[in-house]
């Protein structure tokens, strides 16, 4: 039907007769001449319909926004003074010879160039929202990322293997989406949270370099960077150490950013231990664009009169830390109160501070409600450690280690960006040497920090039985600008070690056999050393496009309530369908919004 795309027309087409198909972006009537901005996936071109064209002009008069048209016409220069440098086709226009309305359109609920739409209306009319140039750009960029990924992995000997979507329910940290089996009454499949176990089994099978760009499903509370179904670049390889895998994956991410958005990432990525990241940044996903670090003060506050600091310093598992804000002395009381409320979200009970007005005046040059509770030598040591300067402000956190890290870590990022301290550079890094386990206070048992198939660090295997809290893992996370974009590890390839990890997690042998017997059996048949990583495709594309929500880079996403406003899913089903699945709903379980 068409010879060219609208957005691809330029001065090279001058004098040619072409046929275009697309949607009416805008129609204008100027002095009897009708101008149409015709849009397709490549962009917009200006169409001109002259009243002398007695066949086409009456049709053009009927045209409205979002009508679908087929137009044939002559490419010519735009008149002097009407060139539009804002679009690639801005130097030319197409003079209509014939025009056909392929399909009219109802009046759309919004304009395609409206940037202030509510997300609800966008998701309800997603098929229209996807016509908008910004969304077209996002989805096409996503395609470029997946294509570049496939090319890189193919060049490095990886093969694409599909793994099952209907699988067994196994605990991986979030709720499973369950699918009832009609044939096997009372039994359920689970949609995969990841292909973790299957890709390990592929390593046992001898497919030593596997990848898959696959859908994963997690029934969890949603945020801007989470969806109930999401896409993962899943990778596994045999006979490589963690440094080999990290080097290879660095190369892949560098290639993606260079090829897709023309960004050169550093080579190599810096590497930092989990303990160092928490100590310096209060987060295992540090945003290195922010040049602020936490300063340790626990040892200084052991005997100070200020009880809040003293108690946190003396109690096991407590921490006192400081965050210096360059130029923060200009912060108003109102702004400090807002930051105090902010850290309260993370469990902090308050936010002490000291303003540095004039260091030459000693204690007299400082301003703070807590100064009277702190001996001068302690204050001077604090100022030296934080390297505070005149005009700075120092915030303090004093509580359990987790609370201090969470609160000051989040405050560090917030202040860094709000006060213009962050750079505009891309700052990737690897975080390594994660703990194997974290203690669950509610359940009073250890939980796997990553997943229970992560191998312990060399020399840490004995801790699995004696002191799980000391065991480090061979896990590694790739972090970019404060966001985890990929996480992986060397896996356990010996059955005896896997059994020890299950025991440390308080998973009894019979339960382990029931849930993971197939894996334990496979590990006894010559399983090779192996490891891998998974990248969040949605998150990577969102960062490349500069959007805050992965919903802007997914064609048909769900809301934060895991609903599709377009199709009204999830929905009720017919009683007959439930009977076939041997399911009966109790009325007390049925809720309506």
Curated annotation (Swiss-Prot):
Q: Does the keyword Protein biosynthesis apply?
A: yes
Cellular localisation: Cytoplasm
The answer to whether keyword Protein biosynthesis applies is yes
Q: Name one GO molecular function term.
A: aspartate-tRNA(Asn) ligase activity
InterPro entries, per database record: Aa-tRNA-synt_II, aa-tRNA-synth_II, aa-tRNA-synth_II/BPL/LPL, Asp-tRNA-ligase_1, Asp-tRNA-ligase_1_N, Asp/Asn-tRNA-synth_IIb, AspRS_core, GAD-like_sf
The entry sums up its family as follows: Belongs to the class-II aminoacyl-tRNA synthetase family. Type 1 subfamily.
- Organism encoding this protein: Nitrosomonas eutropha (strain DSM 101675 / C91 / Nm57)
| Residues involved in ATP binding | 218-220, 227, 484, 536-539
A Pfam family it matches = GAD
Q: What is this protein called?
A: Aspartate--tRNA(Asp/Asn) ligase
Any one Gene Ontology biological process term?
aspartyl-tRNA aminoacylation
Subunit architecture: Homodimer.
Q: Which GO terms describe its cellular component?
A: cytoplasm
What superkingdom heads the lineage?
Answer: Bacteria
Q: Which UniProt keywords apply?
A: Aminoacyl-tRNA synthetase, ATP-binding, Cytoplasm, Ligase, Nucleotide-binding, Protein biosynthesis
Marked site: Important for tRNA non-discrimination = 30, 81
Q: Where does L-aspartate bind?
A: 172, 218, 450, 491
Per the record, which residues fall in region Aspartate? 196-199
Query: Which purpose does this protein serve, as stated in its record?
Result: Aspartyl-tRNA synthetase with relaxed tRNA specificity since it is able to aspartylate not only its cognate tRNA(Asp) but also tRNA(Asn). Reaction proceeds in two steps: L-aspartate is first activated by ATP to form Asp-AMP and then transferred to the acceptor end of tRNA(Asp/Asn).
Q: State its Enzyme Commission number(s).
A: 6.1.1.23
